[in-house]
Amino acid sequence: MNPNYLDFEQPIADLEAKIQELRNASAGPAVNVEAEVHALQDKLRMRTAQIFRNLTSWQVLQLARHPSRPYTADYLRVMFDEFQELAGDRAFADDKAIMGGLARINGRAVMVIGHQKGRDTKEKIKRNFGMPKPEGYRKALRLMKMAERFGLPVLTLIDTAGAWPGIDAESRGQSEAIARNLIEMAELKVPIICTVIGEGGSGGALALGVGDRTVMLEYAVYSTITPEGCASILWKDAGKAKDAAEQLGLTAPRLKSLGLVDKVVREPTGGAHRNPTQMAKRLKAVLLNELDALDKLSTEQLLEQRYARLRSYGTYEAA
């Protein structure tokens, strides 16, 4: 099976292989298979739509983790006119799991900050698999405070399995760094738009996730823990991760129905990795619309609405 296809995409892979075989055959003399190719292409479109209409939470998670899914760096290349990366937390080190800096989107100056995973083994190690340490979150906060000083909106791109849980991170105050970001982002005097582009794992994601708007890509996920971790804790069996994924309610439509996500951005057929450029253009349009809406608010209105938004989470009515 083509490694770019997930298990549940096997019927799609088979049809695409047949189409390719026919195209190769048509290269010979006096062979015309266009009618058959068109018929298979129609069948492929219908089968793909059918599969992606009925995805389970576990299958959505596999798409969110797809090795070819666009990362922060990929969106930076397509969505922004300019990007100047800024490094370091000015206290300990530069954490490569977080990248951020000054950018322009349609000529508008913004501060962009996001998790960054790696493609190959070398880059994965360099980026620590997209799992930040305290210095990463402190770098992010430094850039947010800089944005506040210059009156720049903050755009965050969330894609992490979680904060790094190593002893080195704990000894440098991992929990404090995350908590500090939550406090400071709640009070930052500039617009903040948070977008979950892949995995949104626990506090490691939330440390870039407090803002005025939360946007989520169609096949991204957002939860307090990974399904594997949840299954290990609840049932002492990581093999029950599929069941945990359903119970966690980690998909974009589910979170939007709960009021935790403001907008879900539709992905290209087959997921963002099938057409990263189209995905980036769709997300760019959404972010520009949200920036325009937030620009109309005064600082006082912005903070009041953000406070009310945060206070609304977790409310319930007694029976």
From Swiss-Prot:
Where does the UniProt annotation place the signal sequence? Answer: none
One Pfam family name from the record?
A: ACCA
| Its EC number(s) | 2.1.3.15
Query: What subcellular locations does the record give?
Result: Cytoplasm
Q: Which residues form the CoA carboxyltransferase C-terminal domain?
A: 38-293
Any idea which GO molecular function terms this record carries?
Answer: acetyl-CoA carboxylase activity; ATP binding; carboxyl- or carbamoyltransferase activity
Supply one GO BP term.
Answer: fatty acid biosynthetic process
Query: Keywords, A to Z?
Result: ATP-binding, Cytoplasm, Fatty acid biosynthesis, Fatty acid metabolism, Lipid biosynthesis, Lipid metabolism, Nucleotide-binding, Transferase
Q: Which SUPFAM superfamilies match?
A: ClpP/crotonase
Predominantly, its location class is cytoplasm
Q: How does it assemble?
A: Acetyl-CoA carboxylase is a heterohexamer composed of biotin carboxyl carrier protein (AccB), biotin carboxylase (AccC) and two subunits each of ACCase subunit alpha (AccA) and ACCase subunit beta (AccD).
| This protein's name | Acetyl-coenzyme A carboxylase carboxyl transferase subunit alpha
Species this protein is from: Stenotrophomonas maltophilia (strain K279a)
Q: What is the lineage of its organism?
A: Bacteria, Pseudomonadati, Pseudomonadota, Gammaproteobacteria, Lysobacterales
